[in-house]
Amino acid sequence: MFTGLVEHIGTVLQVTEKDTTASGGDGVSMVIGDCSKILEDVQLGDSICTNGVCLTVTEFDMARSQFKVGISPETLRRSDLGELKPGSKVNLERAVKADVRMGGHVVQGHVDTIATIVNRRGDGNAINFTFKLRDSQYGKYIVEKGFIAIDGTSLTVTDVDHEQSEFSISMVSYTQEKVIMPLKNSGDSVNIEVDLTGKLIEKQIELSLLSYIKDETSPLSTLIGKLVEKKVDDVLKRN
């Protein structure tokens, strides 16, 4: 679990399409450097949120200035990590500790989809970004003043246009210095993880409704039965 408060900006040093080494897992791997600041207490097998994606550390260099991660096909489908190349900058955050304040919000590192920056404009000392979701079904989980993780950064939604599958955020000057988004422009992609709370509520309601519908003695089934009977009676009376 992560907080969405980026600790460090690293640099992609190497991307291997088919890494046959023990630490590569016979798939896509990535080496990220310029990050000794966050590697002091990280062990092999630990998780590091990389541009919003929870990735497992599989290798260090001797100086602990860089680390390797493997990237699964599912991650490549869901995120934009496949677009990264040597020189790309990435947001990094270590997994949260029990004694860390939750200054952002609960971020799993499980990216749902990507979005494209469709507008960027200055607003005093802030930068306002507008994004368009690739997969519109995730728009229902995005609400004004709610949380959202963009490239692993915990941000507050300022506006939502559900019909266009678009939403906006405003980034204050302090955050601009700590994350990679100010380096991006219109047309660039970002990783999106919607707030888990909305998903949990939706699933609980869905399962509860299904349970009530299947139970003929439940209050909901009784109510539906009465409504259907009333509708049928009304139709018969008109005929």
Swiss-Prot record:
Superkingdom in the source lineage: Eukaryota
InterPro entries recorded: ATP_synth_asu-like_sf, Lumazine-bd, Lumazine-bd_dom, Riboflavin_synthase-like_b-brl
The protein's enzyme class: transferase
A matching Pfam family: Lum_binding
EC number in record: 2.5.1.9
UniProt keyword list: Repeat, Riboflavin biosynthesis, Transferase
Lumazine-binding repeats: 1-105, 106-205
Gene Ontology biological process terms from the UniProt entry: riboflavin biosynthetic process
Record-listed 2,4-dihydroxypteridine 2 binding positions: 54-56, 70-75, 109-111, 145
Inducing stimuli: Repressed by iron.
Catalysis: reaction(s): 2 6,7-dimethyl-8-(1-D-ribityl)lumazine + H(+) = 5-amino-6-(D-ribitylamino)uracil + riboflavin
Residue pairs linked by disulfide bridges in the UniProt entry: none
Binding annotation for 2,4-dihydroxypteridine 1: 4-6, 154-156, 170-175
GO function term, MF aspect, one: riboflavin synthase activity
CDD domains with a match to the protein in the record: Riboflavin_synthase_like
Coiled-coil ranges from the UniProt annotation: none
Subunit structure: Homotrimer.
Described purpose of this protein according to its UniProt entry: Catalyzes the dismutation of two molecules of 6,7-dimethyl-8-ribityllumazine, resulting in the formation of riboflavin and 5-amino-6-(D-ribitylamino)uracil.
Name recorded for this polypeptide: Riboflavin synthase
Organism name: Meyerozyma guilliermondii (strain ATCC 6260 / CBS 566 / DSM 6381 / JCM 1539 / NBRC 10279 / NRRL Y-324)
Organism lineage string: Eukaryota, Fungi, Dikarya, Ascomycota, Saccharomycotina
Name of the gene this protein is made from: RIB5
